[in-house]
Amino acid sequence: MKDVALQLKNVGKSYGNKVVLESIDFEVRHGSMVALLGTSGAGKSTLFRCLTGLEPIDSGSIVALGESIHELSPARLRAVRGQIGFVFQQLHLVKRFSALENVLGARLAEMPIWRVTLKSFSRADKVLAFECLDRVGMLDYANTPTQLLSGGQQQRIAIARALAQKPKIIIADEPVSSLDPLTARSVLQTLKAAATDLNVAVLCSLHQVDLAREFGDRIVGMRDGRVVFDGTPAEFTDERVHALYQVPAGKMHQRPRATRSTRWPVWLWHEGRSDDHIHTPHTRAAPGHRTALAPERALQRQTSAGADRRHGAVVRDRTTHRNGPHGGHDGTGRGQDRGPG
């Protein structure tokens, strides 16, 4: 039996006369991923604010790593939060910073991220950041300004930043709500790998039933501020889906998804392309050229390239970043494809 990392016991929360959370009970164990489902207004966002300690609770307790977070002193609460990685729908990445710099920001909890430079970090911190980028498949983009990355890639950077804290718990609030299906699965695979490979307890809120069934070790369903289902994906039958959402289960996947990728023709998805391919960064190397480096080698390259220049901004390879963010060459001798139209 895996140890319990996060446990909610009879949690209640009200705003005036309006009850938002009532008798919430469930737990998340180390090495497992719990998918939290619910309709809009079910209380998921309020619950996540309570989990961060930003909102007080009216009754019950939230126990993280053996400590009730709403009974801790501010100093002790900061220490417990340091062992919890948060991934929010609003990523709070510094867009002008590189992917590497955003991940390194997690290593300096007491310093505002806009004051961070590469000189602020030890060699061990830099190696850890490269390892986290490698784990989420973003090592090739360590030097890339975050504003040039697609939504799915930015989400992976946020996960890498959470992993850089060496967390025992990861709490992800709607991490794939604005992503296309292929990219959403890729991001959830990254979170699932953190649970299985690093023994991290992952709590992830979702809207998509199929994704919850595919990636969750357990599913918790909320409606009207209460937990109405807590069980395995196999137990989450179509009848239980109907009971949770109060609509016929067969209609669940027919809702149109309004994402920023819907302006692209449908054939992009039929060919298996994801959001990452639509918004290709301009630091991708020529076909067949391996740019991924082992963390130690990548760090050596950073150091030799003078990575501490310009307030810590990472110096990019001139051969792969020639003509700015909107066109020109990508290092292959060909122009960038901006998509149809």
Curated annotation (Swiss-Prot):
GO molecular function: ABC-type phosphonate transporter activity; ATP binding; ATP hydrolysis activity
Top-level enzyme category: translocase
Pfam families registered for this protein in UniProt: ABC_tran
Domain ABC transporter: 6-249
Keyword match ATP-binding: yes
Bias (Basic and acidic residues) ranges: 307-320, 327-341
GO CC annotation, single: plasma membrane
Catalytic activity line of the entry: phosphinate(out) + ATP + H2O = phosphinate(in) + ADP + phosphate + H(+)
Subunit text: The complex is composed of two ATP-binding proteins (HtxD), two transmembrane proteins (HtxC and HtxE) and a solute-binding protein (HtxB).
Functional summary from the UniProt entry: Part of the ABC transporter complex HtxBCDE involved in hypophosphite import. Responsible for energy coupling to the transport system.
Protein name: Hypophosphite import ATP-binding protein HtxD
The organism's taxonomic lineage, starting at the top: Bacteria, Pseudomonadati, Pseudomonadota, Gammaproteobacteria, Pseudomonadales
